[in-house]
């Protein structure tokens, strides 16, 4: 497949090049704006909607009145009467069973949307330009791998076809039948309630046949699934960009292809079939930004780059980070050193003072021991021995001694052992 520029080959009904060429219309070089296409498609699609609404009486066809307050139930209106489950049930409210919906739909909603004519034409130009790019057409899902050329133009003889078998043979010769087979394979049942509303089956989109005059071409192609037929004078954005996505596979007749310049004009000449209409211009003629920015005209107007780089320094707390503190206050190192030395000096003084006090205490204890006539105890062992000596208790005198004195145990009289003579029984 080729994307031909600026001449397009015209293909015969046998699928071969007829030898004729057509100049590529300027509309195929128009800017592709998917945002505009999507906006126009969304708004125009709303014009096919049929108004719908719920009945104005729905949910209100019962007699109900609120019970008021003081009954320990909600104040919603309740059905009158008795003898049935319905009596006493809530009514009217959107939270009630059998009540009306919230904000009942009305038929006087603003169903339709008006779109500017120039904007609609811009969308059609974008859709036509996208249909000539193989990448966009293939991304849409069309099977055009074997198609000889894009845009695909055929002879005007095709407009005179009246039989479907002729149309099928043409599509097979043009290698476009793969796209129809894709449609056949995609036919399936719709999911959801559309099945109940005469929309049971769905399928993919196939090629779009664009013609100039209907000499039977509609009857020949209309029964092939997925085919869409359009008159070149009545192009529709809903058909050229289904779903609001550009890239529809289009097959043109020669006369319809030649008529595009008259319909949409070029950038040098206005459209002859539309009043005061010119093709939309590109925002940028050259889209190679690197080439534009490096051009001498742009570089001459630019200032020289600033080589100095200002790096953001991470803010650190000088009270926790000594290196940052020394940057801010170099004397902090001296202060810190003096503090450490002062603490060491004070610690040494406390240790010396404690040692002197211990020596004085030891000397005092030695003097007392010498006065008592005891050998002075020296060292830790002596201290432990001195500590370990038990104090002798003073003897108790008087009533306390009598109370605390234990009674002496009574001695049993000693039994005499019998002698041998006593042991002998009497004769």
UniProtKB/Swiss-Prot annotation:
Cross-link (Glycyl lysine isopeptide (Lys-Gly) (interchain with G-Cter in SUMO1)): 364
PTM section of the record: Citrullinated by PADI4.
Compositional bias annotation for Basic residues: 377-397
Region (Disordered): 369-427
Pfam families: Ribos_L4_asso_C, Ribosomal_L4
Keywords: Acetylation, Citrullination, Cytoplasm, Isopeptide bond, Methylation, Phosphoprotein, Ribonucleoprotein, Ribosomal protein, Ubl conjugation
Segments of skewed composition (Basic and acidic residues): 407-427
Cross-link named Glycyl lysine isopeptide (Lys-Gly) (interchain with G-Cter in SUMO2), sites: 239, 327
GO cellular component: cytoplasm; cytosol; cytosolic large ribosomal subunit; cytosolic ribosome; endoplasmic reticulum; extracellular exosome; focal adhesion; membrane
Modified positions (Citrulline) in chain numbering: 300
Modified residues (N-acetylalanine): 2
GO MF annotation terms: RNA binding; structural constituent of ribosome
InterPro entries linked: Ribos_uL4_C_dom, Ribosomal_uL4, Ribosomal_uL4_dom_sf, Ribosomal_uL4_euk/arc_CS, Ribosomal_uL4_euk/arch
Sites bearing N6-acetyllysine, chain numbering: 14, 106, 259, 333, 353, 364
Function of the molecule: Component of the large ribosomal subunit. The ribosome is a large ribonucleoprotein complex responsible for the synthesis of proteins in the cell.
Subunit structure: Component of the large ribosomal subunit. May bind IPO9 with low affinity. Interacts with RBM3.
Similarity section: Belongs to the universal ribosomal protein uL4 family.
Name of the featured protein: Large ribosomal subunit protein uL4
Native species: Homo sapiens (Human)
The encoding gene: RPL4
């Amino acid at each position: 497949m080729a994307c031909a520029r600026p001449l397009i080959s015209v293909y015969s009904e046998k699928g071969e090049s007829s030898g004729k060429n057509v100049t590529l219309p300027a509309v195929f070089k128009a800017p592709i704006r998917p945002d505009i296409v999507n906006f126009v498609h969304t708004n125009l699609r709303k014009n096919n909607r049929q108004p719908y609404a719920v009945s104005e009486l729905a949910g209100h066809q019962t007699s109900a009145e609120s019970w008021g307050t003081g009954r320990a139930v909600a104040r919603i209106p309740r059905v009158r009467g008795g003898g049935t489950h319905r009596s006493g049930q809530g009514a009217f409210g959107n939270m009630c069973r059998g009540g009306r919906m919230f904000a009942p739909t009305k038929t006087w909603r603003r169903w339709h949307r008006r779109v500017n004519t120039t904007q609609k034409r811009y969308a059609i130009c974008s859709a036509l330009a996208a249909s000539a790019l193989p990448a966009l057409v293939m991304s849409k899902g069309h099977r055009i791998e074997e198609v000889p050329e894009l845009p695909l133009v055929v002879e005007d003889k095709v407009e005179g076809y009246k039989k479907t078998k002729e149309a099928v043979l043409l599509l097979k010769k043009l290698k476009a039948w793969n796209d129809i087979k894709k449609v056949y394979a995609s036919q399936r049942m719709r999911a959801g309630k559309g099945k109940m509303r005469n929309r049971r089956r769905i399928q993919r989109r196939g090629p779009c046949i664009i013609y100039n005059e209907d000499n039977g071409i509609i009857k020949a192609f209309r029964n092939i699934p997925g085919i869409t037929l359009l008159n070149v004078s009545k192009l529709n954005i809903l058909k050229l960009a289904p779903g609001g996505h550009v890239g529809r596979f289009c097959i043109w007749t020669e006369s319809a292809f030649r008529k595009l310049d008259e319909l949409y004009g070029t950038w040098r000449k206005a459209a002859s079939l539309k009043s005061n209409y010119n093709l939309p211009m590109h925002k940028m003629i050259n889209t190679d930004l690197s080439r534009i920015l490096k051009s001498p005209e742009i570089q001459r107007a630019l200032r020289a780059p600033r080589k100095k780089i200002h790096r953001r320094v991470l803010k650190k707390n000088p009270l926790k980070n000594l290196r940052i503190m020394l940057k801010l206050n170099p004397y902090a190192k001296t202060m810190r050193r003096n503090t450490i030395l002062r603490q060491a000096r004070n610690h040494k003084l406390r240790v010396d003072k404690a040692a002197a006090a211990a020596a004085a205490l030891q000397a005092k204890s030695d003097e007392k021991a010498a006065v008592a006539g005891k050998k002075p105890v020296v060292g830790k062992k002596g201290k432990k021995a001195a500590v370990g000596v038990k104090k002798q208790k003073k003897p108790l005198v008087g009533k306390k001694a009598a109370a605390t004195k234990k009674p002496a145990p009574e001695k049993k009289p000693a039994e005499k052992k019998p002698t041998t003579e006593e042991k002998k029984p009497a004769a």
